[in-house]
């Protein structure tokens, strides 16, 4: 057990193995439905990626930015080398996986081209459709914040792209602004997506 606990990747792998075992038990007891299984696995991937993405939005706004503001130059340099690049990597890739899996899920659920999936039109209650598309538009805006504003400016802050002190200060302010916007959007987007599936 200790080798697993000592390695976060081993912990994640163990969790995935346990989840796979639960899925196998379900398939044995309930039977297999190929299309339903694919839809579920895409949804599961989408939820996992969204959890990481929103979790990191909370981390960046309430922990990372606060720590960077409070740290001295030496502490800030350490955070920029050891923490911020890793957070940015997970942030970017989780957002992309969430958006791509979400797009695939829209197709599988019949919100996009239902006749291609089901062979006929699929009725979706208008309130549910509006909630889903509200979430989609908000999520795409959040993804754009990450890849078009936060990451390019973060590269200047981290010294990956050239910039003098004034450019770094301006880039830092832009990162904070769009990180805050991501936090604002995260709550209604999550609400809309969950409500579309579960709000009676």
Located regions from the model:
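Polytopic transmembrane helical bundles with strong interfacial aromatic enrichment
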Residues: 1-200
